Amino acid sequence: MSEDQYMGNLYQRFPVTVEKGKGAHVWDIDGKEYIDCMGGYGVALVGHQNKRVNDAIKEQVDKIITVHSSLYNKTREEFLKTLIGLAPKGLTQVHLNNSGAEAVEAAIKFARKFTGKKGMVAMKGSYHGKSFGALSLTFNPKYKKAFAPLVEKVSFASYGDIESLKEAIDDDTAFVILEPIQGESGIIVAPDGFLQDVRKLCDEKGILLIFDEIQAGLGRTGRLWACDHWNTAPDILCLAKGIAGGVPMGATLVRPDILASMSKGEHSSTFGGNPISCAAGVAALKSITEDGLIENSEKMGKLFKEGLEKLKENHTMIREIRGKGLMIGVEMKFE
């Protein structure tokens, strides 16, 4: 466990040194097998050592490892076409980056530039990352207090409450950002009708709507996109985690008129669109959409919730079970 002397105290560490993985299982250096319930905090979406992803990475490594986006690359082109072919309606352009926080940072800049406005509205209970802009949109004070003051002109509305959102916006609001299912705050599912109401309100006020599907997207909820449960599309969509099968990647999907407002050089990423990440991304997206992972998430999620509900009948400490697909949370009570 000598990593600690080099990495400081930034992470909650567990006394397991992982050596290898396969599917939903990992093995430590002593050969002990574990079921990986962590999954890299949502990254191992297609499982460890997914054959499609492994083969794609090996093939790409033998061609070229890095190509900056100032040059063209066929692997990147294939990934972009694949991703846009699956994107919510109207989102036909992409900025490729390296993480969820970077995807959110790009969304902030794009929305502010396009609207010419500065105000930002996020939700109470939100989590969007720990870089400065994303942290400003994250609700939990424990992540923010030590770094104040953060980005100004951020307001928070109560999740699921359209009247609270109406009070939070003003004439200088550039965008509203929300997770269709809040992850870090406890798997809080948007009430039916809420996303549609937010979409209507944003359209009426000329405000952009950003969905953060970094955790909820890519089939986890039994739909490719969590927002599909409510037939509502955003103006900007933030993705990361399992998008490249475990290789670092983030993506900010956007309407073309929004991205057209940006001038060359106003935003970029040195490693965004890396060919290895893109090769892995094509493979991961094909695995999600062609190997039955979305359907499996819906089917197994129903079975899992049914089993949890039976447990709840006999265990009063279980307060509530909520979620969609295999994105499930169990709230406990200890009174």
Residue ranges of model-derived segments:
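Conserved N-terminal phosphate-binding loop of PLP-dependent enzymes in the Aspartate aminotransferase
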Residues: 1-335
